[in-house]
Curated annotation (Swiss-Prot):
Recorded name of the encoding gene: fdxr
A single GO molecular function term of this UniProt record: oxidoreductase activity
A single cellular component GO annotation: mitochondrion
UniProt KW Transferase keyword: no
Record-given protein name: NADPH:adrenodoxin oxidoreductase, mitochondrial
Reactions performed catalytically: 2 reduced [adrenodoxin] + NADP(+) + H(+) = 2 oxidized [adrenodoxin] + NADPH
Positions contributing to FAD binding: 54, 75, 83, 119, 404, 411-413
Amino acid sequence: MSTHKAALCKVQILKLFLISARCVRITRFYGVCGLSTSTPASSPKVCIVGGGPAGFYTAQHLVKTRTDVQVDIYERLPVPFGLVRFGVAPDHPEVKNVINTFTQTARHARCSFHGNVRVGKDVTVEELQEAYHAVVLSYGAEGNRTMGVPGEDLAGVYSAKDFVGWYNGLPRNRELRPDLSCETAVILGQGNVALDVARMLLSPVDILKKTDITQHALDALAESSVRRVLIVGRRGPLQVACTIKELREMVNLPGTRPEMEASEFEGIAETLKSLARPRKRLTELLLKAAIETPGEEELEKRNKAERAWGFRFLRRPLEVLPSTDLIRAAGIRLAVNRLEGDGEGVRAVATGEVEDVECGLVISSIGYKSLPIDPAVPFDGRKAIIPNTMGRVQQTAGLYCSGWVKRGPTGVIATTMNDSFDTARTLLQDIGKGTLDVSSVKPGSQGVSALLEKRGVKPVSFSDWEKIDSEETRRGETRGKPREKMLDVGEMLQVARA
């Protein structure tokens, strides 16, 4: 934005703020839901972009640590909680319990939620910077890493992100309609998301129907012909990226049996003593499932199983093979790798051999990536993160970042919590040292709300979200589920404004 345009933007926000000054004074005197009646006019005002775990954890630390800070969370969807709502597997309700903590934060007197606001479109980051003392970008990773191989645009090939969004009710993925008429599915990637997808494909419907999986996904999975899932990785058993919890769930999944190549585990048992305890436990469980002779009870269970899963190691995708009509996926060609190096420096190197696997469903689980949100915000396209130092966006005073857009899409929710707390601490330290000036009066949400009103944008408050929450819970109860998620943004807004 030019200096002239930036100046006009600043004047516009200040005018809107002065026009609403009387309203602001009345609000401070009488108080409204979500605002503190004791917050002085010069208190620090912080805007957080993104209503997922990173945003809520950043807000939590700010309002708990400093008693005068006012925090506003802006989220593009009408519903909060981001990856907890749309990324956590339906059969992991215990992970979603963190929503209770986020709800407490959203109900805090000095924290407000503003859903249905698209930062970068409805309001720019520069406009937010004019309205707040600090802006924290916590909007996560909306993009997918692509395989970059021929055939990945064929029907029957999906990203894990889109597939997860489909069964978890992300509005943008509600029309995905994956074709599950094939017998074999191949998942590329061996992290927790890959195992979540495998588990959803193979889980008995009687288990899934008690979760908050969307009804359209449940109906599709009930009719699925998928009976075999291969989970493919480019490195070996000692580098598998999932955690022991997710692996144990696969091993114990009712109605399934593991099918793996014993040759891929040669020499692994001899390395156990040298492994760190978490990796050792994971590898022991993997070896038990792959090559140990099962006991009588386990053998009977496996013999009765109608579905199978297994890891395939040292394989890299070369091409998705098309059907005879060149429309659908009919298989995948894999390069066979070998490992070179030791320890953390081990790398996969192609041997020149290839292997073709017949399959009608290919799901790529090779990672998410963040995307730029606004031309005014620096972005490292190669690393797919906002360049930062301890959460401070480089060369941009008053702008911070937390979560995946800060460090990349890695780790579990606890990792994001610690990362977000770190950014909040950095911001508060800057206030304490005076490097972040909070002495001037900023309009905060009052100024932004005036801008949004002029542009015809109606934000969704947290109390509005609670109407959606109640209706989803009611619909779920009629089906014996925790909730039945709304899939259409228009319907969400209609319920919120009823």
